[in-house]
Regions:
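Glycine-rich phosphate-binding loop of ATP-grasp-fold ATP-dependent ligases
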Residues: 19, 174-188
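Conserved beta-strand elements flanking the ATP-binding pocket of the protein kinase catalytic core
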Residues: 161
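Short secondary-structure junctions
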Residues: 154-156
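ATP-binding N-terminal substructure of ATP-dependent carboxylate-amine bond-forming enzymes
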Residues: 1-135, 139-141, 145, 149-152, ...
Length: 188
């Protein structure tokens, strides 16, 4: 019997769909290599009756991928509804599944996935996960902060400027790449 791996996907960022696609491919590869792996949407979670059989590898991942993509939340509306019920970010049974897993594969992209928030929660709960720790994730999510940390250490970085709201742009040479400071890698 192989390791039990929970692949967390989805979430609430603008990169939700790419997260689901990435996680589907990762899960397929893990299964081909003998691991008991399955996908859970970190925001929507899973029904209680499916928790015990989560690592059985018997679901159709392509069908699950399509289903999850169709569950795209109206984030603000959903978060307000959860607040009214006294619930937080994590979907039903997500944390319980992650605690049962031998390790959690972080298939999330963007905010609430790559920015250290989930990593911090997992560290507090003793949940093992892939990727960088919460502080490294938080620093690297901000392109401006990353540059401020790495350049003084002599690590080469491409030239760039950070523009803030109300900032008057004097000159930006072309060609250039425009990215949101704290957006995920697939935005911009």
């Amino acid at each position: 019997m192989g390791m039990n791996i929970a692949v967390i996907a989805g979430g609430t960022s603008t990169e939700r769909d790419i997260s689901i696609l990435t996680s589907t491919k990762v899960c397929e590869s893990l299964r081909r290599n003998g691991y008991n792996a399955n996908i859970v949407d970190v925001f929507f979670g899973i029904d209680s009756e499916n928790v015990d059989n989560f690592f059985n590898n018997d679901n159709d991942l392509e069908k699950l991928c399509k289903y999850l993509k169709n569950q795209t939340p109206d984030v603000e509306k959903e978060l307000e509804a959860r607040k009214a019920l006294g619930k937080g970010f994590f979907g039903d049974n997500v944390l319980e599944l992650c605690q049962k897993a031998d390790i959690v594969f972080m298939g999330l992209h963007g905010s609430n996935g790559e920015d250290g928030k989930i990593q911090a929660a997992f560290e507090l709960m003793g949940i093992k996960y892939t990727g960088t720790d919460y502080i490294s994730s938080a620093i690297s999510m901000s392109k401006e902060l990353t540059k401020k940390v790495l350049v003084p250490e002599g690590i080469p970085m491409p030239k760039g400027i950070a523009l803030h709201k109300g900032h008057k742009v004097e000159y930006v040479p072309f060609p250039c790449v425009v990215k949101p400071c704290c957006g995920g890698s697939s935005v911009g």
